[in-house]
Amino acid sequence: MDYVLIVLPLALFLIAYKFLFSSKTQGFNLPPGPTPFPIVGHLHLVKPPVHRLFRRFAEKYGDIFSLRYGSRQVVVISSLPLVRESFTGQNDVILTNRPHFLTAKYVAYDYTTIGTAAYGDHWRNLRRICSLEILSSNRLTGFLSVRKDEIRRLLTKLSREYDGRVVELEPLLADLTFNNIVRMVTGRRYYGDQVHNKEEANLFKKLVTDINDNSGASHPGDYLPILKVFGHGYEKKVKALGEAMDAFLQRLLDECRINGESNTMVSHLLSLQLDQPKYYSDVIIKGLMLSMMLAGTDTAAVTLEWAMANLLKKPEVLKKAKAEIDEKIGEERLVDEPDIANLPYLQNIVSETFRLCPAAPLLVPRSPSEDLKIGGYDIPRGTIVLVNAWAIHRDPRLWDEPEKFMPERFEDQEASKKLMVFGNGRRTCPGATLGQRMVLLALGSLIQCFDWEKVNGEDVDMTENPGMAMRKLVQLRAVCHKRPIMTNLLA
């Protein structure tokens, strides 16, 4: 009798589950893919690094293939022509939505931030605010002094504490990029030396770390609904995390109202709130703050570390970049943002780093608002659509010797059109220009001010960390020697 009581409900569940899932995809001509297991689908196959696994699947099943994560259909695109088909015209409109995951419900204000909101009037308003009020060319130029100050602090620290010594770059680059964004948003420094308020800074760091650890689609309940019954602990955790971050951001807003801090994104948005409270509510401002401080930091720091790693592996490239800067800028002053236009080889180095080592190897997922076709296959409404940018950036059909670091390939202006570091279509990252400016200026300054060499002549480990963001598994260590320009800078 006990056996029947256990087996019968399980059998009924399996039958109901199979019926419910098959009814969602019945009659569709889905892209090919591996044979799924009952209930879990292909979850048992998904092992990091996922972008490399997906490239192997693409080699076997084609440039577009399908998987099943529990009850959710997943489609992965791995070719440039299919990406262009997906994100142009009406298809781009259909694919503007994001799939829903549990963390975003509680941390991203119930899917209302610019990164999570559904396509519609609310999202268009957020996009308008970003384009015109936060990340316009004039606004970014207005924050150039912040970028230059943070870079100068980094250069000074390297010169005084690490001249002729081994330095681990990742923590310093992370401090640089986090401080740049947080100062733009709030006017405060939370990382490195001379922080605004140590207690407040430590709380912010902990919240950011906890959100990053729980972000993405990491909870099985996102794919197997029955597990939500047993997953209340996780849901309570991310709910509490969202409430803690909201309280932190609200305190920053309230303090800014009282103190009237000038030339920050928050102060500018609060000034607009006075005339248009509907379009600049506290929730909208907090959502924009959250998006900037979470999404605007990782990419730049990761890209800078990969760029330096590639330069150490290719000293002839580093030498050529240094010669370009010395010729165009000299050693009497630091490279400045307006100089970047006259440093094409530096630009090519950054483009090649974006290509070979994208910080986000899989683009942020999309979800169609209605059924559509891609590559002749049916993509049902609600499917999780992923683009394997890493695989496309190494596609031998697009690139000569794709595994090699060769900045010269971007001397052909058409090459940059094949990059997709910041997404595609309507949901291209609104902070792309800011990220590029920061990486170019910081990398140019590091090349101009120091001679770099490997530690004891050892080869640079280029192994990837198996996470959603493609960091280096082994943090980059190098020896830096200050050049004469640093004497002038510190005088």
UniProtKB/Swiss-Prot annotation:
GO terms for molecular function: heme binding; iron ion binding; monooxygenase activity; oxidoreductase activity, acting on paired donors, with incorporation or reduction of molecular oxygen. The chain crosses the membrane at residues 283-303. It is a single-pass membrane protein. Its cofactor is heme. It is found in: Membrane. One of its GO terms (cellular component) is membrane. Signal peptide: none annotated. GO terms for biological process: cellular response to hypoxia; defense response by callose deposition in cell wall; defense response to bacterium; defense response to fungus; defense response to insect; glucosinolate metabolic process; indole glucosinolate biosynthetic process; indole glucosinolate metabolic process. Its EC number is 1.14.-.-. Pfam families: p450. Heme binds at C429. InterPro entries: Cyt_P450, Cyt_P450_CS, Cyt_P450_E_grp-I, Cyt_P450_sf, Plant_Cytochrome_P450_Monoox. CDD domains: CYP81 (cd20653). Pathway: Secondary metabolite biosynthesis. It is an enzyme of class 1 (oxidoreductase). Induction: By beta-aminobutyric acid (BABA) and elicitors of pattern-triggered immunity (PTI), such as flg22 and elf26 peptides. PANTHER family: CYTOCHROME P450 82C3-RELATED (PTHR47947), CYTOCHROME P450, FAMILY 81, SUBFAMILY D, POLYPEPTIDE 5 (PTHR47947:SF62). Belongs to the cytochrome P450 family. Involved in indole glucosinolate biosynthesis. Catalyzes hydroxylation reactions of the glucosinolate indole ring. Converts indol-3-yl-methylglucosinolate (I3M) to 4-hydroxy-indol-3-yl-methylglucosinolate (4OH-I3M) and/or 1-hydroxy-indol-3-yl-methylglucosinolate (1OH-I3M) intermediates. These hydroxy intermediates are converted to 4-methoxy-indol-3-yl-methylglucosinolate (4MO-I3M) and 1-methoxy-indol-3-yl-methylglucosinolate (1MO-I3M) by indole glucosinolate methyltransferase 1 and 2 (IGMT1 and IGMT2). This is Cytochrome P450 81F2. The lineage of its organism: Eukaryota, Viridiplantae, Streptophyta, Embryophyta, Tracheophyta.
